[in-house]
C-alpha cells in the first residue's frame, strides 16, 4: 500500500522533480507473484525497476528483486509390497519468511526430511509412500510429513537411523529451532502401494 501511495503522490505532484516514470501496480503477489506473472510488459519503456517494500513499519527498502517458481514433474513407478509403514512428522520448527528471515539460518523442515530419507535409503531397503512439505512458495518450512514402507525386520534399524539423523540436526539448530521435534508411528504389516526402488532413489 505504501508503495502505491508513494508513486501516486510523486505522479500527482508538480513540485517534485523526477525523470519520466512508469508506475506499475499488480495484485496477488503474496500468494505466488500472480500479478507480476500475468502482466504484459511489452508497452513498458523504462530501463530501471524500483521496488518499494519492507517488513517493518517506518522503514523503506528501495530495491529490485525477483523470484522464480519451478514446477518439477518426475515420472515414477509403483509396486505393491508387503511391508510395515513408518509415518513421520517433523514439526515445532521456527520457520519464517524466506525473504525477511532467510539470513537467520533457521532449519527448513523439508530439507531435514530429505536428509533423513536419504540416510534411511542408503542403509536399508526403503520405499517412499508419500511426502508433504506444505504449499507456500515464500516460507521456510516448519512442518513436514512422510510415510515410508520398510520390511518388518528393518523397522528397528530404520527408527534408529531416523532418530540419529534428527538428533544431529537438532543439535545443529539448537539455537534457532529449540522446539523442533519428530513423531514416528509404525503401522502393522500390510499390502501397500509404494514407489519402486529406483523411483524412491530419484
Tell where the protein language model's regions lie, with residue ranges.
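Short amphipathic
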Residues: 70-73, 84-92
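Short acidic, glycine/serine/threonine-rich loops at helix termini
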Residues: 33-39, 60-65, 100-103, 141-143, ...
Amino acid at each position: 500500500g505504501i508503495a502505491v501511495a508513494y508513486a501516486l503522490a510523486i505522479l500527482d505532484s508538480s513540485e517534485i522533480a523526477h525523470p519520466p516514470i512508469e508506475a506499475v501496480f499488480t495484485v496477488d503477489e503474496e500468494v505466488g507473484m500472480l500479478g507480476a506473472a500475468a502482466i504484459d510488459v511489452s508497452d513498458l519503456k523504462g530501463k530501471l525497476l524500483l521496488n518499494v517494500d519492507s517488513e517493518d513499519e517506518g522503514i523503506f527498502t528501495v530495491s529490485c528483486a525477483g523470484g522464480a517458481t519451478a514446477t518439477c514433474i518426475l515420472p515414477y513407478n509403483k509396486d505393491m509390497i508387503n511391508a510395515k509403514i513408518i509415518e513421520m512428522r517433523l514439526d515445532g520448527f521456527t520457520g519464517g519468511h524466506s525473504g525477511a528471515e532467510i539470513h537467520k539460518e533457521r532449519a527448513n523442515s523439508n530439507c531435514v526430511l530429505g536428509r533423513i530419507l536419504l540416510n534411511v535409503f542408503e542403509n536399508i531397503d526403503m520405499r517412499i509412500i508419500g511426502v508433504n512439505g506444505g504449499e507456500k512458495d515464500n516460507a521456510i518450512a516448519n512442518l513436514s510429513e512422510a510415510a515410508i514402507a520398510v520390511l518388518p525386520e528393518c523397522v528397528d534399524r530404520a527408527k534408529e537411523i531416523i532418530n540419529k539423523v534428527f538428533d544431529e540436526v537438532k543439535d545443529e539448530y539448537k539455537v534457532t529451532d529449540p522446539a523442533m521435534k519428530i513423531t514416528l508411528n509404525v503401522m502393522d504389516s500390510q499390502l501397500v502401494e509404494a514407489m519402486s526402488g529406483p523411483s524412491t532413489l530419484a
